[in-house]
Amino acid sequence: MLQGTCSVLLLWGILGAIQAQQQEVISPDTTERNNNCPEKTDCPIHVYFVLDTSESVTMQSPTDILLFHMKQFVPQFISQLQNEFYLDQVALSWRYGGLHFSDQVEVFSPPGSDRASFIKNLQGISSFRRGTFTDCALANMTEQIRQDRSKGTVHFAVVITDGHVTGSPCGGIKLQAERAREEGIRLFAVAPNQNLKEQGLRDIASTPHELYRNDYATMLPDSTEIDQDTINRIIKVMKHEAYGECYKVSCLEIPGPSGPKGYRGQKGAKGNMGEPGEPGQKGRQGDPGIEGPIGFPGPKGVPGFKGEKGEFGADGRKGAPGLAGKNGTDGQKGKLGRIGPPGCKGDPGNRGPDGYPGEAGSPGERGDQGGKGDPGRPGRRGPPGEIGAKGSKGYQGNSGAPGSPGVKGAKGGPGPRGPKGEPGRRGDPGTKGSPGSDGPKGEKGDPGPEGPRGLAGEVGNKGAKGDRGLPGPRGPQGALGEPGKQGSRGDPGDAGPRGDSGQPGPKGDPGRPGFSYPGPRGAPGEKGEPGPRGPEGGRGDFGLKGEPGRKGEKGEPADPGPPGEPGPRGPRGVPGPEGEPGPPGDPGLTECDVMTYVRETCGCCDCEKRCGALDVVFVIDSSESIGYTNFTLEKNFVINVVNRLGAIAKDPKSETGTRVGVVQYSHEGTFEAIQLDDERIDSLSSFKEAVKNLEWIAGGTWTPSALKFAYDRLIKESRRQKTRVFAVVITDGRHDPRDDDLNLRALCDRDVTVTAIGIGDMFHEKHESENLYSIACDKPQQVRNMTLFSDLVAEKFIDDMEDVLCPDPQIVCPDLPCQTELSVAQCTQRPVDIVFLLDGSERLGEQNFHKARRFVEQVARRLTLARRDDDPLNARVALLQFGGPGEQQVAFPLSHNLTAIHEALETTQYLNSFSHVGAGVVHAINAIVRSPRGGARRHAELSFVFLTDGVTGNDSLHESAHSMRKQNVVPTVLALGSDVDMDVLTTLSLGDRAAVFHEKDYDSLAQPGFFDRFIRWIC
């Protein structure tokens, strides 16, 4: 016992001496290592700001308020970007650059500018207030950074925009953002206000969007304060990403002196079974087999299905009358032919031979045999050891020479807890640690009792032979296991190298003899892989001859045979007696019929509406804030009003008649006009075509200059004597502050009657009434206020404008006994989406349902359908049958496929239910118009055609009318039958009685006159 105690004390003294020697050597060596470490890693960061100063941003009320907030947001942002040592490992330094854009780009600070010059240049920019070409701004930014690129610089870009674009001349946002990311630029997308397009911002931002988009905004919602949280979050991401780019572990890679040779380690445990090897190379192609015998003929095929009946051909043209033939002689009556005997019935055919049996599959390869486990029984679990205190990880010191034994110091207490550090980047994988020292010898455990033998499992069914599988993917690395229990004495290791002769130690106590018993049974090996496919089997024997087949079914009747040849001409017969007088003939054409044909042929007998000598100039806003859909409604308003003014002067230079001109405007230099004296505008149809060809400019808003342009270029240069001049101005009342406000009265005091129409813009910003009063020459009665652009085309407002422009019209009709309708211009191709809403109530009836279904198909065949779903021209058609509140049936969505429309109509069933048209309208908008697949096109005119008598439930009727106005729906109502509810029909037509076609029954749908009138109306 005394000898064991002396051994422990001697070992302790030796270890203490070694530790003291190491501490003496570590101190100067650590100082030398710190002196050899390089300085903190330099990490230059360039931040580029891209500011949107287009009209959709800067014209928000009040003007340039969002640009003012940008000029506050950016300096506050960069004031928090200080040069610093981040995590005491990288030295961050900041430089800046920036540009602002609209439909043009201006670089106000090149990349690499310092803070003072950048802020000075930022405060000097002014907004463009025109269109939005974001892709060109991103392309310009990328080129600027590429030219100024320096090695080791981290680039970030902060793009402040609302996501709206008016054009993509540089390839689109996605393309340019991807090119910027390829250049190593990380893009943050920040919204200047709440009127944003989120998808556009996500197209700009780098991924993941949780870092580079994350609802960043310059201002707090419903406030004018800078969003400090956005600044903090973006800066945090910038620093962390820059740290990951710049930080390199270099000081920790200094090699130390080699340590002493270690003891030979214990023999390792048996390793696990290795991963399956990769499949071997594909074997060479086998030799071609011998040619097989010719097979027996196959059985006779069954007769094909009878073909569908073809469609009726088009009516042929009426042939010219032939010359009168000579009187023929009566021929002799021929003899009747004999009826031939029936043919013999054929014998049934023999049953064909059976097919060859399938080839047998090849046997699979034998799987690998699992390794046999070591036998043995598990010992009893030893007592758990005490948990030692976890020490802090120290630096690996250099191995020193053995020193004299030192005095053991007292055990130090735990140090204070350090501050929580910022989360660092993921560390590089460390080097593999050296083998640990042997643990203390554990006590020998008593042998445990042998466990009972388990029950035998049931014999499973033999599995099917599977194909050879590919090796599975490598499994994830298992979690770090818990520290093991105190182990038993290991096997003796191999003899190590002979060491230096040491001092003779005391004699040790003899150990107890160890137990020898088998270990636990090893785990079963993994299941072997299936073997390869076996060789193909030989050809099977011929099967037995089959029994005779059943008697065939009776065939279909054959087509009649060809007609026989005519017999020879017989002798002339005796003249017959005089015949009786025939039935009375059809009545001749009436004067009305003749005049109808004349009017349909030449159109020279129509009534004309004359407003006297009248000049009308429409000034319409074509700026970015209006939006494409609202601009289209402006053009439709102009066409609808001019339709009410009657015929246009055939000679624009004559002193009488109506002339119409149009000015569409955006920013300076973009004005376009249809002149009053344009010789090409000599009819209503030519004027409509010119208006439809006007394209949305999508720039700034220079209303005062546009009014001056309208007077100087249209009214002043072509004014006629004794002619009333009207001007209709459509705008939201706001304009670019750089434009001269004095020109708002450019049409006043010039004998011009001005009507100013103020409507909210695409962002639902209210118009400014003060500017509207200036445009209308301070006459409040000539100012019209509206909320939605769809109110422009309402029937009531069109009537009001007709009364303003032509208060005392003169209707001149030819003296004809028959009346006719006003001529309508032919249908022209443009994008139209037509949704038919068919009343499926019990009042309709099965027969009328089929007539309505045929009418929808005829309309689809008559219209020029689109070539694809995103075709910018032509029409698409949809059908919804509505019944009770929960009984709406979409027969087919908006489609351009005539075959699909025909098949859907054939399978549509009559509902025979109640009628709630309000629920039908809401369902049509949600399920057809707003459908993510095949919904209404963005720039197409949306038309709802109702087939109903108006006798329906009034639930949500007015709400559905409001929904149609919000969707800019153009309604048409086909009121069929004598018992109709005009109040409901007027509500469905949004107050436009001209859009209600009242016919006596559903048979009228097939009348050519009604059908042509309907087609011209919806076009």
From Swiss-Prot:
Q: Which UniProt keywords apply?
A: Cell adhesion, Collagen, Congenital muscular dystrophy, Disease variant, Extracellular matrix, Glycoprotein, Hydroxylation, Membrane, Phosphoprotein, Repeat, Secreted, Signal
User: What InterPro entries would the database entry show?
Assistant: Collagen, Collagen-VI/PIF, VWF_A, vWFA_dom_sf
Instruction: Tell me the outcome of changing residue 932 to L.
Output: In BTHLM1B; results in reduced intracellular collagen VI assembly and secretion
Keyword Phosphoprotein (UniProt):
yes
- According to the record, the residues making up region (Disordered) are 257-588
Q: Which positions does the record annotate as the modified residue Phosphothreonine?
A: 701
Determine if Glycoprotein is one of this entry's keywords.
yes
Q: What is this protein called?
A: Collagen alpha-2(VI) chain
Q: Upper lineage ranks? A: Eukaryota, Metazoa, Chordata, Craniata, Vertebrata
